[in-house]
Regions:
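Sequence context surrounding c-type heme c attachment/ligation sites in exported
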Residues: 21-25, 29, 33, 79-177
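Bacterial N-terminal signal peptides that target proteins for export
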Residues: 1-6
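Hydrophobic h-region of N-terminal signal peptides that target proteins for export
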Residues: 9-18
Length: 177
């Protein structure tokens, strides 16, 4: 019995340490992502009445048809670059189909927001989020919410892929590191 209690206590301590060390998906990340969603609603980047652009062809892991917006947003008193990418599908969907019924084809919304200096200096202070169309956070297969320093230090994922560009963007050279 004592061995089982010790094992459970050890497992709980390890889980707590891992949760505290997680580079993304924390309660603080989720709260910040919720604040960011509210800002994007005010800017009409998401939600009812969101503005639209002409969709263009994309590639995985984003949608096969995309809309991308570059603007600024202010979260908790900090104003930073805000990039909102709407990811549409399924494979074979056309720009005309997306324009006719965007809500039927929207799979997710991926966002990069440049936070305050020092947030993540290794990765130009970008905050990464993947939302479902209703504003809830998407999760990876392990159940971690995709908000914060998503996949920091991993061989694949948001940061690993985007670090292949000097400014972490593949669509706009006007935003400097």
């Amino acid at each position: 019995m004592t061995k089982h209690i010790f094992a459970l206590a050890l497992a709980a301590a390890a889980a707590t340490a891992n949760a505290q060390d997680a580079p993304f998906g924390t309660e603080a990340d989720a709260a910040y992502a919720a604040d960011l969603w509210s800002v994007m609603e005010e800017l009409r980047m998401v939600g009812a009445g969101m503005i639209h652009a002409i969709p263009y062809e994309g590639i995985e892991p984003h949608g096969l048809m995309l809309e991308t917006f570059f603007t600024e947003g202010t979260v908790d008193g900090h104003t930073g670059t805000l990039i909102v990418k709407r990811n549409y599908g399924p494979a074979g969907v056309s720009a005309d189909e997306v324009q006719a019924a965007p809500e039927e084809h929207l799979g997710s919304i991926t966002v990069m927001f440049r936070r305050e200096q020092g947030y993540d200096a290794d990765n130009q202070d970008w905050f990464w989020v993947k939302y479902l169309p209703d504003g809830t956070l998407d999760q990876n297969p392990a159940g971690m919410q995709l908000a914060g320093r998503v996949a920091k230090g991993a061989d694949a994922g948001c940061i690993a892929c985007h670090s292949g560009s000097d400014n972490y963007l593949f669509t706009n050279a006007a935003i400097t590191p």
